[in-house]
Amino acid sequence: MMKIGVFVPIGNNGWLISTHAPQYMPTFELNKAIVQKAEHYHFDFALSMIKLRGFGGKTEFWDHNLESFTLMAGLAAVTSRIQIYATAATLTLPPAIVARMAATIDSISGGRFGVNLVTGWQKPEYEQMGIWPGDDYFSRRYDYLTEYVQVLRDLWGTGKSDFKGDFFTMNDCRVSPQPSIPMKVICAGQSDAGMAFSAQYADFNFCFGKGVNTPTAFAPTAARMKQAAEQTGRDVGSYVLFMVIADETDDATRAKWEHYKAGADEEVLSWLTEQSQKDTRSGTDTNVRQMADPTSAVNINMGTLVGSYASVARMLDEVASVPGAEGVLLTFDDFLSGIETFGERIQPLMQCRAHLSALTQEVA
């Protein structure tokens, strides 16, 4: 079975950088409605990112953002089955604090919580607070994250850490209570360094889908992750990010997609390109360089599935056929209606979710 998750819109306007796309602010009530609807349709998990400074432009893209841990704590309290993941911007939060917050949300959720660790690539997010460690950090960020996760594992596993490293020094550091079950750690490494980290420490790794209606184009990325995991003797699957834009017919959906592209906020796209060029130390295979690619920058170049309900179902089944692909993380042009049509019209047609069809119909 392929896992299905929703990438909740913690920032304004979700993931479409377009004046023609729905314009909305992030609120707890909106995200509660989205995640409860996702749970109703048997989505497996919900994840929120963290963004500390937006991209500006006419659409004020991501200038308005909630905070990930507090949002997901609230969502954990109003759900009962769906897995909940928050994102830690590790430059802003000491690992001992993240360990304690995660243990708290584990208690709120009844063991349904996990943590997504990010190193931070957007320099202005951290410069505005005076905590950017300098541009050498670009080349050492996974060294930093390795120490960070070792402290987390100590505290979650034993309740105590005396870790000593280049970045962190723990002196009989304590966290109790500990999580009720082993805490899941996820990452989104796409560079060689990121995948090596995920292979060693993550439970699964997110990657970008690629292109428009090319559902298996990410296969080389999944293969790289699989190969990296084989080096560590661990099973670390890939979860792939896609935007779903669906309607009754392929033509109607294609027209909607072209309309969104025609309204692209060029000021935001230029700024994103500029930011992607700031990191000259991490190589050419990072997530941010894919985000800024002009091919489909209107939705940050995540894989895009545009078509009728049947076409999208077929393409998601193709995703499931890729070796190493264990799940997808979905965004929608309109989240509330998108999740409903996914649950009612797309998921029942998916072979990789066929076992849920009868169950979904019972609760619909």
From Swiss-Prot:
Tagged with keyword Protein biosynthesis: no
Enzyme class: oxidoreductase
EC number(s) recorded for this UniProt protein: 1.14.99.46
Reaction(s) catalysed by this chain's protein: uracil + FMNH2 + NADH + O2 = (Z)-3-ureidoacrylate + FMN + NAD(+) + H2O + H(+); thymine + FMNH2 + NADH + O2 = (Z)-2-methylureidoacrylate + FMN + NAD(+) + H2O + H(+)
The keyword Flavoprotein appears for this protein: yes
Gene Ontology MF annotations: alkanesulfonate monooxygenase activity; uracil oxygenase activity
Gene3D superfamilies: Luciferase-like domain (3.20.20.30)
Coiled-coil segments on the chain, per record: none
Factors inducing expression: Up-regulated by the nitrogen regulatory protein C (NtrC also called GlnG) and repressed by RutR.
Family of this protein: Belongs to the NtaA/SnaA/DszA monooxygenase family. RutA subfamily.
Name of this protein: Pyrimidine monooxygenase RutA
Organism: Shigella flexneri serotype 5b (strain 8401)
